[in-house]
């Protein structure tokens, strides 16, 4: 049984840990609020751009839409992980979803420091062609525009690349987020549906010089927008997961402190009672 001094030391250590996890929870909450506002604001832009792109695509017969690909070809997976730890099952859920779909001849492009070691630890044999560490301050559209350009070039020039897919965390609410997959190339099936009506944004416009030229000129922007939207949404989920993990850790620490204090008080009371008994017994002996 632990002595009073040992119990005191444990309480101090756990109290120190509780302060750290609570501070991290507050930081994560602040980041979550900021990222959530960014995500909600940019979702408006994503929706309007998606509607416009779908309309232009439905009027285009660009060769990129009919590229012949090998049925035995590989898929490039653009996977989003965190660059920091202590975010609960956030990264593990992405790996589990990746394991459901990936094949050994596929290729992985990793965004986020924590992905590489986790993927290797799970025995995924696919080649990792890109391993990019990405902090919150590094999120900018220019970076994803470059990634989109490289992905499109590989897709157009390599017959054996049959598809490019994105796997990321989809935000449901602050307590719920799930791994999700969508096709970047070939274009998602929802975009394949013909659309004759113009986007309902109150503007009257025409496509000049023609739908094919406009489609090919904004395709990179569309791909970059999809990638940017996925990383922003993943960042919301990451900070929500970290906030929840730190909140749970703080509550568990406080519960441990409570239990140790009860144990400390019981042991102290027992020792005091023992001392009183010994004093009384000694007095009677005299």
Curated annotation (Swiss-Prot):
Keywords: ATP synthesis, Cell membrane, CF(1), Hydrogen ion transport, Ion transport, Membrane, Transport. It is a peripheral membrane protein. One of its GO terms (molecular function) is ATP binding. Pfam families: ATP-synt. One of its GO terms (biological process) is proton motive force-driven plasma membrane ATP synthesis. The keyword Ion transport applies. This is ATP synthase gamma chain. The gene is atpG.
């Amino acid at each position: 049984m632990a002595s009073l001094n040992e119990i005191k030391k444990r309480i101090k250590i756990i109290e120190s840990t509780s302060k750290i996890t609570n501070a991290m929870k507050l930081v994560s909450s602040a980041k979550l609020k900021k990222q959530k506002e960014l995500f909600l604001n940019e979702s408006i832009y994503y929706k309007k751009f998606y509607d416009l792109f779908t309309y232009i695509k439905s009027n285009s017969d660009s060769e990129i839409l009919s590229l012949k690909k090998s049925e035995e070809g590989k898929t490039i997976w653009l996977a989003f992980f965190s660059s920091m730890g202590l975010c609960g099952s956030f990264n593990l859920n992405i790996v589990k979803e990746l394991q459901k779909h990936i094949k050994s001849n596929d290729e992985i492009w990793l965004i986020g420091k924590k992905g590489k070691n986790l993927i290797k630890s799970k025995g995924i044999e696919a080649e990792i062609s890109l391993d990019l560490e990405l902090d919150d301050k590094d999120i900018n559209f220019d970076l994803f525009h470059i990634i989109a350009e490289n992905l499109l070039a590989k897709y157009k020039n390599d017959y054996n690349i049959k598809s490019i897919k994105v796997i990321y965390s989809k935000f449901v609410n602050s307590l719920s987020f799930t791994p999700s997959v969508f096709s970047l190339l070939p274009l998602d099936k929802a975009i394949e549906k013909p659309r004759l009506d113009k986007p309902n944004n109150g503007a009257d416009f025409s496509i000049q010089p023609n739908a094919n030229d406009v489609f090919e000129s904004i395709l990179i922007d569309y791909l970059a927008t999809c990638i940017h939207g996925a990383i922003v949404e993943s960042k919301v989920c990451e900070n929500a997961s970290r906030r929840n993990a730190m909140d749970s850790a703080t509550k568990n620490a406080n519960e441990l402190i409570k239990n140790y204090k009860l144990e400390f008080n019981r042991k102290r009371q027992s020792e005091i009672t023992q001392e009183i008994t010994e004093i009384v017994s000694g007095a009677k002996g005299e």
